[in-house]
Amino acid sequence: KESALVTAGWSAEARKDAFERTMKSGLPTARDEYWKYTSPKSLTSKKVEKAPLSQEKDGAMFTGANPIKIVFVDGKFAPKKSADFEVSGLSVERLSIINKLDLHWAKDVYGKYEKLSQESVTRPLASYNTAYADEGVVIHVSERIERPINIIYEHSDEYSDVILRHIIKIDDNAELTLLENGPAAARLNQVMEVKLSDGAKFNHIRVLGRDHERRTATHIFGELGGEAKFKSFTLTVNGVLTRNECFLNINGDDAAAHISGACIGDGDFHHDDTVFITHDAVGSESRQVFKKVLRNGATGVFQGKILVKPNAQKTDGYQISQSLLLDEDSQFLAKPELEIYADDVACSHGSTSGAIDE
């Protein structure tokens, strides 16, 4: 409801705009072309399906990397479980705290790339997140950070329904590695917006799943400046429904975006990777590489698009999606697309699926 929106502070204008866009579009349904292969019903229904509490020790997954730990439990920041740190060139704040301020640098990022993504296709879950998200991390990086940040998710409520929003700004020639893992909620709607300035580097690794019962929709939106490098890899193991969306704008010459993922699905597992990369600069590069192993009736989906604008000469864009089907009941659905308006490019896509040779 509109009365639940934040009506003061630096994010209020973006939230109101997102609310109005969501009301105009409505929540997604199975009739929408963009949701042709994945029913959004369990992500939009008022009822949250039960997800038994995890017994896995996900918090120890990346211990060997000596990360800076930030922990969320049921979508709320857990200070006693999180690290207390001071690192030169790194600022980490909570959205719920800075939201009360009148001015903040995050105003120039919050909702900007989410709204831009809506020009190509309507994404109501993302605009809903912009309107209502009240927690997440806001990260500003001005140097090369040696230690990775590890966001660890836990849930203590079998019916937890969580909305999270992360905002990341990386300055010229600075670098950050971000790790994500753990069961965030029975149902999760998460958005991450990333702004990479010239020469900035962002390395992102996340691990989702290991439990069948969770329902997750994640979105990554971002912009790349000149010679910026954006790398994101997601490993997904099970989950009733996982929808990972990524929309990136390459606006700087010689920048590169590599988006990849792997998943192992069993039974009623349904996993959807949907990626849209826009090239709007000279000499830019993109890679979309996704591989899935499916059995016992599991379903995998890949929707990928590369858009090359007229000025984006010498673009190098590549897509590949592959699946291994371990039985006749499993299925892989793919929709790779190229839309090219420049004449000096090297772009290709491919998709294959099959069984193990006997």
Could you tell me what each predicted segment is?
Residues K1-T130, V289-R295:
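N-terminal amphipathic, basic helical "cap/leader" segment at the start of enzyme domains
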Residues I98, D108-E358:
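Conserved beta-strand/loop scaffold segments within soluble protein domains that form the structured core
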